[in-house]
From Swiss-Prot:
SUPFAM superfamilies: Metallo-hydrolase/oxidoreductase (SSF56281)
Cellular component aspect of the GO annotation: mitochondrial matrix
Name of protein: Beta-lactamase-like protein 2 homolog
Species whose genome carries this gene: Drosophila melanogaster
Sites where the protein binds Zn(2+) 1: 76, 78, 145, 163
Length: 292
């Protein structure tokens, strides 16, 4: 993985502060972004909870900038994006009236265990705008990675992509059907560069987004063909993996099956497969177009 410094000024109005929480899932760590050029700034995401090194770096930046945080925008509910809220709100890093915003979840109660209940979460809305001196961002709801995921479109073609698009590798998702629609939505924005939630800046984002879309579409066609060739069989994800992912080491098959299940769910939503239940187990069966 490429090295990412703890603090990087990306533009005159964007400073990236690394969350100092590296792992297999977070890559170099969570990227958080300080927006604006005046004394009151917007912070996108807050890293993990209880990471003193991150809070120290954030504090140093704010001191150098002679600024504080008055708005926190959370791209989604995962702990490595919301965990730092409690170490910022109510401290010298933030204005007394600092507000925290997050889009509501639709799959579960909209509660973040890492955020104390006395810190109010204000709802985000699709196309809502936030402005501070030197920066303006627009909220774009992009479900798929999670139901509450948003990206933030900034002036001059900059997009903050959260975990929808990563600086390295491909993203994970809860709902592939929604995720693919969100990728198309981002493609329509035509970003000129992407500041991701993990990994380095993406300077040629259109190619990256198209790669994400094409990669998933190609895999989906392989999976669908597997069913077409077995039109009357009740099949599960691992049946697909053993054939479509036969070149993949067997110890990685469970992870492959996780992805395949997302594809199967998407194909079922599109009417290309149907669900068959037998002995409390779910199977998928090919659904010919003529049967629709």
């Amino acid at each position: 993985m490429a090295l990412i410094p703890a603090v990087t000024r990306l533009t005159s109005s964007v400073i990236r502060i690394l969350g100092c929480n590296p792992s297999a899932m977070t890559l170099q760590g969570t990227n958080t972004y300080l927006l604006g050029s005046g004394s009151r700034r917007i912070l996108i995401d807050t890293g993990d909870e209880d990471v003193p090194q991150y809070i120290a770096h954030l504090g140093d930046v704010l001191q150098q900038e002679k600024a504080s945080i008055d708005t926190i925008l959370l791209t989604h509910w995962h702990h490595d994006h919301v965990g730092g809220v409690k170490s910022i709100v109510g401290t010298k890093l933030a204005e007394k009236d600092c507000r925290v915003f997050k889009f509501g979840r639709t799959d579960a109660p909209d509660v973040c265990p890492e955020i104390p209940t006395d810190i109010k979460l204000h709802p985000l809305a699709h196309n809502q705008e936030f402005t501070t001196e030197g920066a303006n961002v627009r909220v774009v709801h992009t479900p798929g990675h999670t139901t509450d995921h948003v990206v933030l479109a900034m002036n001059e073609g900059t997009l903050f992509s959260g975990d929808c698009i990563l600086g390295e590798g491909t993203a994970v998702f809860e709902d592939l059907f929604e995720y693919m629609k969100s990728l198309e939505k981002i493609l329509d924005i035509k970003p000129q560069r992407i500041f991701p939630g993990h990994g380095n800046v993406i300077e040629e984002p259109i190619g990256k987004i198209e790669y994400y879309i094409n990669h998933r579409n190609q895999r989906e066609q392989q999976i669908l063909q597997f069913f077409v060739q077995r039109p009357n069989e009740n099949l599960q994800a691992m049946d697909v993996v053993k054939v479509v992912y036969k070149e993949t080491p067997e110890n990685l098959w469970p992870a492959a099956a996780y992805n395949v299940n997302h594809h199967l769910s998407k194909l079922e939503k599109e009417g290309k497969l149907r669900v068959s239940k037998s002995a409390d187990e779910e199977f998928y069966v090919y659904q010919p177009t003529s049967a629709l």
